[in-house]
């Protein structure tokens, strides 16, 4: 009996399920789906693995580069498809692989000192809760370099003011992470938590209704906050780059320590 040759689009959902079983984050799963859809413009996902060739994969990469996306985006798309092909090889669907594509070296931006002065200025005492909360969030992002998904998932019980530490329950690696708080940040959180109140399992940075902030709500909150302070750039991830720059350049910090603080699995990720 002739063995069936599966179509790429048929196998992709199986790959995603296998990755979910391994415990990859929901954001990673979303990236798989988003990149797979985008790659569909450059590779016929209805073709079978028997029809897929080295030349077809090379044509996909050429088409990607000609589409006008950045070199790093090409690398990101290729990285996802390479992971997919690696799983397919292990499952016996194909013998093909995709070569590793190096990102082009780029200088990561960060908030300027002038922008930081504007962003870190404490709001007036009669400001509303949202503005005050956003000021605390900005302070936390600059002092910790944590990801947006991480800060949204911090609960009141995760903050130990006595030990000056905070636990990250939601990380890209899926592992709990305990990071230190500087004295100034601990003081800011102490005041904020006294005003915020709530149960231990409540989210630290909540909406006015005490609920967890969505990804979009956090992004919009920071955008509104930054614009009100006269700062046009509103990227949350830019705070992460700013923290890294401050730690390494301004404070002469150790790259290996920075790797742990940022939750990177390799030092190469920290360098980028």
Where are the regions that the model predicts?
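Conserved catalytic core of the tyrosine transesterase superfamily
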Residues: 1-272
């Amino acid at each position: 009996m002739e063995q069936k040759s599966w179509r790429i689009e048929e196998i992709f959902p199986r790959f995603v399920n296998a990755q979910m079983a391994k415990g990859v984050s929901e954001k990673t799963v979303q990236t798989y789906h988003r990149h797979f859809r985008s790659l569909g413009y450059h590779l016929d996902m209805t073709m079978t693995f028997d029809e897929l060739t080295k030349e077809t994969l090379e044509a996909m990469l050429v088409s990607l580069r000609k589409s006008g996306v950045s070199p790093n985006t090409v690398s990101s798309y290729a990285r996802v498809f390479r992971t997919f092909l690696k799983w397919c090889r292990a499952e016996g669907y194909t013998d093909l692989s995709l070569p590793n594509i190096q990102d082009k070296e780029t200088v990561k931006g960060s908030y300027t000192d002038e922008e930081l002065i504007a962003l870190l200025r404490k709001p007036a005492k009669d400001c509303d809760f949202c503005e005050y909360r956003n000021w605390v969030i900005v302070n936390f992002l600059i002092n910790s370099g944590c990801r947006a998904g991480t800060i949204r998932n911090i609960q009141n019980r995760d903050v130990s003011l006595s030990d000056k530490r905070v636990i990250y329950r939601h990380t890209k690696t899926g592992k709990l992470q305990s990071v230190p708080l500087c004295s100034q940040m601990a003081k800011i959180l102490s005041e904020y938590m006294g005003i915020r109140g709530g149960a231990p399992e409540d989210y630290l940075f909540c909406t006015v209704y005490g609920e967890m902030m969505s990804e979009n709500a956090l992004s919009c909150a920071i955008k509104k906050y930054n614009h009100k302070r006269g700062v046009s750039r509103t990227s949350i991830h830019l705070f992460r780059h700013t923290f890294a720059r401050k730690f390494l350049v301004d404070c002469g910090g150790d790259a290996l320590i920075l790797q742990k603080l940022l939750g990177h699995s390799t030092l190469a990720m920290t360098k980028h």
